[in-house]
Amino acid sequence: MSIQNNRLLVLASALALSPAGHAATFCATSTAELQNALDTAAVNGENDVVRVAVGTYPAPVGGPFDFDQLAPVNGDGLSLTLSGGWTAFFGNPCGFRSEAYNSFDTILDGEDRERVLRIIPDGAPDIVIEGITFFRGNPSEGGTRRGGGLEIRSANFTGKLRVERSAFLFNTADYGSALEAGGSLIRLRNNLFVGNDAVNSGVIEAVIGNGDSGIYLTANTIINNATQSSAASAQGGVYIFLWTDTNALLVNNVIQGNDVTDLKLSGEGNVTLRNNLIDVRVGSITTETGQITGDPMFVGGLLNFTDFTPDVGSPLIDTGIKPPALIPFPPPFDSNWGLPDYDLLGRPRTQGVTVDVGAYEALPVDVFSDGFE
């Protein structure tokens, strides 16, 4: 569930959300089961839902977890939802998932020997990833390596991608150390990117091609990502390329402490920033409102890599914005965004006056915690 935009035309909304066809559902409790589910999902002629039970899953020997709709002769080009956080219920090992799941409970581990997950879509499927931690991805193939945690190869992909309430920790690649993404519309919301290391450049690399719609980055925490390169173009932060007439909307993000540049924008598209804390930016910004500055003041110490909750006094607390409640149809690009109901640790998304900035929601301060009333 998520904080949804309430569209004025209910019928149009219902049509937009109606499924393309029957969905096949899989449950994975081991590396082999997960890869088998992805193999079947690529060719079975159905939209597919792959549920991953809570646990840690090493990447297969000799390659990443792989969803490839081009290699099989009969790849179906239909949609995939991959979600973590599932637990046993009445004999089904993937029978239940709380809406308040913890995104660090389901880990796909590249073990520093393989990319974690590669998705090669064909045509215009919807690709959705929820509640997965991508850990220690390191692609083993030769040539230019992209997307150490997750690679969405986009040459034949004209569908939509959504990555939500997921984490990318300690991945590496030449470009896009954590994520390489493409598609007609990309939504990255309420994710953590920390400790990833690019041989050349970028923790996230997203290219929005000619004729595509754009990219939404909403409520992400993207910090302390590195580059090994000393080249003038190298940087450890987010890289977005926009063709003419494409769009990027960045709302409620923390992008800070990344090597050289936190956000690098290229191309000729339209870029809107709202209520972000972004330190070092390069490139043209069309519109910016609600800029936040200063030390984000996270609760964790130097060895913390999973909890970046804003501490008391943080400029991130109650400085985010919510999606518009009413928008016209068809919705303008800058209004057509949303937020999950829960943060990365499974806490309700709004604790105070409004949402906090970043992937974590601070809990209310107990003014009587010292024992005096």
Map each language-model feature to its residues:
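Surface-exposed loop/turn segments connecting beta-strands in extracellular beta-rich domains
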Residues: A59-P60, G85, F90, E111, ...
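Predominantly extracellular beta-rich ligand-binding scaffolds that present long acidic/polar faces
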Residues: G63-Q69, G77-S79, R97-E99, I152, ...
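C-terminal accessory segments
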Residues: R118-I120, P125, T289-E361
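Bacterial N-terminal signal peptides that target proteins for export
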Residues: S2-L9
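N-terminal signal peptide c-region/cleavage motif recognized by signal peptidases
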Residues: S18-G21
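N-terminal extracellular ligand-recognition/capping segment immediately after the signal peptide
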Residues: T29-N36, N47-L80, G85-P93
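Right-handed parallel beta-helix
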Residues: G123-S201
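Right-handed parallel beta-helix/beta-spiral solenoid domain characteristic of secreted/periplasmic
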Residues: D76-G142, T293-P296
